């Protein structure tokens, strides 16, 4: 009986010794482990290549400001917006080319060809002839047509987006604003020209007004009153006498 038990135990040990070792029990540095490492590195490299290709096919989204400007350029303005001329200002002009240096005092205009532009300049010269009388203003001002105004403050004090280009009846017009401001941004110590500095304090400054301009609200164009530079004035105050 004891011999039979010894024989079974020996046969069992021989079977365990002869059984092949699994890959999970292979020691570090063996050929099986090297194959697994190579396979893992290859899969990681392929994953990185796939990620780079995906990024190239799907670029990063554009900024919100760029999208807003692009959408504003594609907005088609309804011609009905220009039928009511009640609040239109002579300081706002829609034109396909740069306007003349002097503004017309009539109303909002559309200049779409050179003949119209030349007629406007001739009419302005005939209406306001130049006189050399040595006339001087109390403040030196400068007036320009502003072509690329994109931001402004509305009548409620909120920032709004101003439309630069207006697509109307398949024609692209640019919105111009005639602005007047003080030529020197820094106040002059001597004050305004022609003011008695012995009795008055004076300085030149720029004042603003509201004009009706075409602005962008969401994906639609709408009229709003915005604030622009309108004039250069002299501010004076009486000097207090010290006794």
Swiss-Prot record:
Keywords: Cleavage on pair of basic residues, Disulfide bond, Glycoprotein, Growth factor, Lipid-binding, Metalloenzyme inhibitor, Metalloprotease inhibitor, Protease inhibitor, Secreted, Signal, Toxin. InterPro entries: Cystine-knot_cytokine, Nerve_growth_factor-like, Nerve_growth_factor-rel, Nerve_growth_factor_bsu, Nerve_growth_factor_CS, Venom_nerve_growth_factor. It is found in: Secreted. Residues 19-125 form a propeptide. One of its GO terms (biological process) is neuron projection morphogenesis. Disulfide bonds join 139-204, 192-234. Expressed by the venom gland. Residues 47-66 have a biased composition (Basic and acidic residues). It holds the Pfam family NGF. Residues 1-18 form the signal peptide. Gene3D superfamilies: Cystine-knot cytokines. Glycans are attached at residue 148. GO terms for molecular function: growth factor activity; lipid binding; metalloendopeptidase inhibitor activity; nerve growth factor receptor binding; toxin activity. It comes from the Eukaryota. GO terms for cellular component: axon; dendrite; extracellular space; synaptic vesicle. Residues 47-67 are annotated as: Disordered. Belongs to the NGF-beta family. Homodimer; non-covalently linked. Nerve growth factor is important for the development and maintenance of the sympathetic and sensory nervous systems. It stimulates division and differentiation of sympathetic and embryonic sensory neurons as well as basal forebrain cholinergic neurons in the brain. Its relevance in the snake venom is not clear. However, it has been shown to inhibit metalloproteinase-dependent proteolysis of platelet glycoprotein Ib alpha, suggesting a metalloproteinase inhibition to prevent metalloprotease autodigestion and/or protection against prey proteases. This is Venom nerve growth factor 2.
């Amino acid at each position: 009986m004891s011999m039979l038990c010894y024989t079974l135990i020996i046969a069992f040990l021989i079977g365990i010794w002869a059984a092949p070792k699994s890959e999970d029990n292979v020691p570090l540095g063996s050929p099986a482990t090297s194959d697994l490492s190579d396979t893992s590195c290859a899969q990681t490299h392929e994953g990185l290549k796939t990620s780079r290709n995906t990024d190239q096919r799907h670029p990063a989204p554009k900024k919100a400001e760029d999208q807003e400007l692009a959408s504003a350029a594609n907005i088609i303005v309804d011609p009905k917006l220009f039928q009511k001329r009640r609040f239109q200002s002579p300081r706002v002009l829609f034109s396909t080319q740069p306007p003349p240096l002097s503004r017309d005092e009539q109303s909002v205009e559309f200049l779409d060809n050179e003949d119209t532009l030349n007629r406007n300049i001739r009419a302005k010269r005939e209406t306001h002839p130049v006189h050399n009388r040595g006339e001087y203003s109390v403040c030196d001002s400068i007036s320009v047509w502003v072509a690329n105004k994109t931001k402004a403050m509305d009548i409620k004090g909120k920032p709004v987006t101003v439309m630069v280009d207006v697509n109307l009846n398949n024609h692209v017009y640019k919105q111009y604003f005639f602005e007047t401001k003080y030529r020197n941004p820094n106040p002059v110590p001597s004050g305004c020209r022609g003011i008695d500095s012995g009795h008055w304090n004076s300085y030149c400054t720029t004042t603003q007004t509201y004009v009706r301009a075409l602005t962008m609200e969401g994906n639609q164009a709408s009229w709003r009153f915005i604030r622009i530079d309108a004039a250069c004035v002299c501010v004076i105050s009486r000097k207090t006498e010290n006794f």
